[in-house]
Amino acid sequence: MTEKKEFGRSGNRDGSEQRNDRNNRSYGERREDRGSSFHNGKRDDRGSSFRGGKRDDRRSNFHDGQRDDRRNYSHDGREDARNNYERDGKFSRGDSDTFKGKTGFKGDAGKPKFDRKQREHAGGEKRPRTAANLDPRQIALETLLDVSVREAYAQLALEKRLKQSRLDARDTAFITRMVYGTIERRITLDYQLDQIIEHDGEIEPVIREILRMGAYQILYMDRVPDMAAVNESVQLTRKMKMGYLAGFVNGILRNLIRKKDELVWPKPEENPARYLSIMFSAPVEFAEMLIDEFGEHEALEILKFRPQKNYESIRPNLLRCDEARLRRLLNDDEFEYESGKVDGTLRVYNAGDMTKLRAYANGLFAIQGESSVLAARAVEAKPGQTILDACAAPGGKTAVISEMMQDTGRVYAWDTHAHRVRLIKGTAERLHIENIRPAMRDAAIERPTMQETLDAAIIDAPCSGSGVIGNKPDLKYRISREAVQSLCKTQQAILNAVSDMVKKGGTLVYSTCSIFKDENEQQIRSFLSTHPDFYVESITSLLPDDLKEHETPYGLQLFAHRDDMDGFYICKMKKMDFVSVK
């Protein structure tokens, strides 16, 4: 088999292959720059940077996103003669939890087409629609309801809906952008709709999401004609068996088209947190937390950041493929790529869904963000050791550690949910790694029988996910002071339990994908104050030159907007070997 064929698309097209990690994934071209002027009234026809797949590099209680991409929307421009009317429906409006405008409409908180050569690898023609398939906008709506009403994670909800739908790449890309664009701008859309709706009361969640979707297309998707957005929204209302509200939806969206240039935006000097909340669609409390910790300017930079170029971060599975071979495979299929900031990683631009490539299915490479790779390498695992990945799913960091150990010794990989343990197993099987021992275990529980049995452990702790909101926009609606306080207690319990399992002279790495000190530096300060047998060890030798200056005596804090990597915290600690102390 030639290398080119090995890198081609695999025959598995049902999406059953789970992505092994979760970092810098971005589909579509970048969004509009929302610079310091904060002008947010411009349409956004340049895609977005949400990235998908199940990935390990952004572990959080709030994870799971999927990527999105641009699509040629010209076929959506058809007019429906049945909808050639306009009236303002009388309907009650929904309670929500973010803003109260004069009308009370308060916010509650794909994959791109492969290029020609990649489509050839896929084989076969476009899969025909079946009776089981829904209209793309209906799938997007159901996914949004999964997230806003059923409190599902966007990534998981979207993956499930797309797998059931069996749509082609074009519709998949459209659905993904619609879902993530609407989630990303939820509060902003509600604020805009708030200025149009003139009715009090409660709005059904279905209608609220249809209005958000319609407003997103009208205000931020230039390739969808305004009237097509209206007509499709009206039809969607009918498909959801709520035709009696079709006139209401029609009237609101038509009024939005007429008045979109007259929308009023808040002024930053009046209420900075509310301003950031509306302009960048973040809950007020989250905006306040950012301002309190980083100041207004830095909070703005954190909320507005989007990658300049969208890419997929990958690394070779060193047990089966070196970097030189991976580069040859990419060259053969004419991928655009460059070296990542972290040694041994590559950034592949306009990558498409790389989980469909045969080389991925054969375990030649892993999709994993550079911050995640860096955290795993901080363990500095050696062959023959016994190591614990305490919060391992779906196994990206576990795999890096196993590769450093040359598939010898033993790596315990724990997670608290059976389905996440299955992801770890899937990652190990795909990468052909044999020294991983997945198990459903709660790392916060003390285990006297394992005391001082580990050469090293890594805790990629459950966290707020505040460092990766650009890729997983649904996470920001879950962030609050109360949530962070609860997470800190969990993190502390895991640190206490796992540290007892580390041998004297052993290594303990703590990481999160958060940017809040309470979850990071303060957590380590507190831990060290009660565990004097541990001390922080520098990881400067592992860092790219431009990151070395950011390491502190209490670890390394990465920021997406500053460092061009996922927001991450990494702290390496060593347990003192008292025997060697004189």
Residue ranges and their predicted role:
Residues 1-582:
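S-adenosylmethionine
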